[in-house]
């Protein structure tokens, strides 16, 4: 992937940042000289994907995968169920990306927008043999295909990389783009966003894949990083909607229930929280294809090959959800109820669950099939998080159950409105 040079003072979070409140110390964090772009994994060319896979293989051979699993498990108690969740994992992912760039400086960690696969996650092309591999096989549930096929890990003890889908050969439904759009629009504070994302799509993916992904050494599964890059993308987009107030917004409590501040250190480091909060500064020398597109770079989400597996963005897809009854919009989509909304708080992208990977070199342009009319008014409810997982994460069972009820209420409201999600196939 090519790096883009950045002029001094370029605002990656948008164009209106003149009144940004910068905390003491943050003003001295230097602007990046080069910016990498993290892309959705389905949009990577064959060359880009192979470069990433090669770097991951090299990191595995040098035992870095074991190290990241070990490190995450050591600090897990303080970085989940608290304000550290988003900022710690932003720093953690960046450290992983730094390691991969030792093998290939052009590599950027892609994200997996797994929300579009929510109806039938196991059928996603991303979990296919060419990419991240699928369910575990055999008595030990070993992953045998994909970038991590036949991996043997040393942490916490010698074992194969394992997955055991939570519904046998399939995965129970995850959280939809419609739900994540609602979280982005209804989260007025950092603490709101952290809780809304951590206790929904975050947990659902870990538990859906199960195996090593359901443990605190989950970074040993390569899905972990694509999953958490997607979570970081959502955080970055939420910041970018109102950069003046959200870039350095950091509230809630830490793992000891003390008020969180931007001067807190990222767990396990000497890095203050404020140093990771503004993309394009310090060591956070990256942005996302979605943010570039929202800032006017129309080519950011469109492949340049003559034949395109992916065509984005789609104004038509983004308009579908805005046609819900006013009462539903007011309750779950306040930005749409009050106007057109910001494109970065609308996760209704034009990728289909049946989308081939761009790296598959489509012979012709891909045309997504229409959604299944038989599924109108039948959006599935996402799976709940079990009590033992919630407690392992250090979260409040009552808080999680309240968030789940909100998600179920949204699904029920959309079904009563006879809504047909474009991702129901």
Where are these regions (language model features)?
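Fungal secretory targeting signals
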Residues: 1-24
